Amino acid sequence: MNCLWYYLGNPDVEPLEDVAEQKAFVEKWLAYAKKHNEKVWLISHIAAGMDIFESYKMWFQKMFVKYEGVVSASFYGHTHDDHFYINRDLNDEKRRPVHVDFVCAAMEGLGGNNPSVRLYQYDDETKEIVDYTVFVAKFEEMAVSNKLEWKEFYHARKQMGVPDFKPETMVKWAEKMWEDEEAFQEYMRTFHTGKYTKGECVGKCKVENLCELLYIIKEDREKCIAEHPY
């Protein structure tokens, strides 16, 4: 998908119901996949996180509910960080989690991070992600050797201590970090692909990062922030 159309930097797009009829195109083929018992991966530069118009975020939430079990995984970049977003059922009072966006850090290392790539492992039948490995090339090592050397940084399931990446699993993992400061600091280290000093992100920074991970819709995210005074 070309989700850059929905980017906040494109104000002319905001009032449009379906720019370039992309939503209709996506739903057409998701309906086809559902009818034929097929699985789908969505790939785009930008996820339905902080940087797209709210109306399109709402569409993503509804789409992932409607085609739950069809969209096995979705992959994004844009933020230059290593993280996730949790999509939820907006018709559910408790905001049931329905889909996880996998957001990969960037190869060029902008934003104070090291260059990074992910190697995904998936189930051949369900097409769900079962694990992934992150590799980084550290700038401080390149400064000495003048070479780009990719080294294994972490295995996701082992690093996070999770059995899978199902939405409910990821919510439990994220919410654990409200109390487990060591786990949160480790998350920030992987978030910044190793270029992070323990204790840099605390208080307001921690609350905003966790609420952004847990809630995509602005109203829900602001409620989350209000419930966790720093």
Language-model segments: residues:
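Active-site-proximal segments of metal-dependent phosphoesterases and phosphodiesterases across multiple
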Residues: W5-A24, A31-T79
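Metal-dependent phosphoesterase/phosphodiesterase active-site architecture
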Residues: N2-Y32, H36, D81-Y230
